[in-house]
Amino acid sequence: MSLSVGIVGLPNVGKSTTFNALTKAQNAQSANYPFCTIEPNRAMVEVPDLRLAELARTVKPERIMHSLIEFVDIAGLVKGASKGEGLGNKFLSNIRETEVILHIVRCFDEENITHVEGGINPLRDVEIINTELILADIEQLNKKIEKLSKEAKANQKGAKENLELANSLLAHLNKGLSASSYPEKESQSYQALIKELRLLSAKEVIYGANVDEKGISEDNDYVKALKEYAKKNKHEVIKLCAKIEEELVGLSDEESHEFLSSLGVSESGLNQIIRTAFAKLGLISYFTAGVLEVRSWTIKKGWKAPKAASVIHNDFEKGFIKAEVISYEDYVNYKGENGAKEAGKLRLEGKDYIVLDGDVIHFRFNV
């Protein structure tokens, strides 16, 4: 499943540092000058899930395998990116290939770290990026309208209706509003248009408020302003300190927990971001549990059992017979498959069963 999260923001706001912390490696170049990242860095990142550890305590497998999500570190955008400034066209194209945007916003003062706009103002920074995304969408939509106009004149099926929708959406964008706030965004025709054009401002957005160490336990004024803005626009803000997240890379889970506790927080901002991005992509996890491995498998919410089985192997879908299903809670509470079975908690589900997040499944198949 090639779904990914694009990390964007102005230059020098902490994108590459965040990416390095996400991947637990020094993959992305990070420096105190604009455009130190040009080609996008890509990495598969484990999705933190405490349920795997609980399952492992019951099964005692040889290994634990987490679900994965792809993050893409995209070079810093600047004002005028939609017109090609700062290699903007290339970078906007990189964003178009992703499904969710993680927008890193600088929310701390530090004289030794330059800011491309000369000073710290999170809302200004957010609007710069949003404006560039909208302008790029307007250009994309104008090209589509030109094509639809010709098709409508030729009386091609559906062209007039699609042209009307495209013009309505264009008027919306020209007001400086994002495609994600379009009133008719739930309509099938809108969804089809968005899928075709991959409009940037239609994507789900998570704001990563990059703070200094002092801002971790208590929101500073920058974070408060960003949260108020995001709430109005129905987006989420997750606070992180990219510098500290990078320092956590070399620590064990126990050491990380102690370090974070000393700062007054229970969980790293990056873990929250990963889980939120996973949900924004419409993904859930089901589990397989055996002595060789306990594993989390990634599927789209709403998938039926045969389709869910295909992520293990295509033969599982082709030869699907039944799915033996135990809920995560029952699996843990009754100490594994045998206990759950004795308690009557194991269910046999057919091809129309919609897999739920946290299901522990054994597939029966024949090929």
Predicted segments, located by residue:
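A ubiquitous short alpha-helical element
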Residues: 59, 129-133, 242
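Conserved G1/Walker A P-loop phosphate-binding module
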Residues: 1-114, 148
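C-terminal-of-GTPase-core extension/linker across diverse P-loop GTPases
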Residues: 2-8, 13, 19, 147-354, ...
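Short, glycine/charged-enriched secondary-structure capping and boundary segments
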Residues: 22, 84-87, 116-119, 220-224, ...
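Residue-level signal for pocket-adjacent positions within structured domains
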Residues: 25-33, 40-42, 50, 54, ...
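Amphipathic alpha-helical transducer elements in NTP-driven molecular machines
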Residues: 35, 49-52, 65-71, 85-99, ...
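Conserved Switch II/interswitch segment of TRAFAC-class P-loop GTPases
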Residues: 43-48, 75-85, 96-159, 172-186, ...
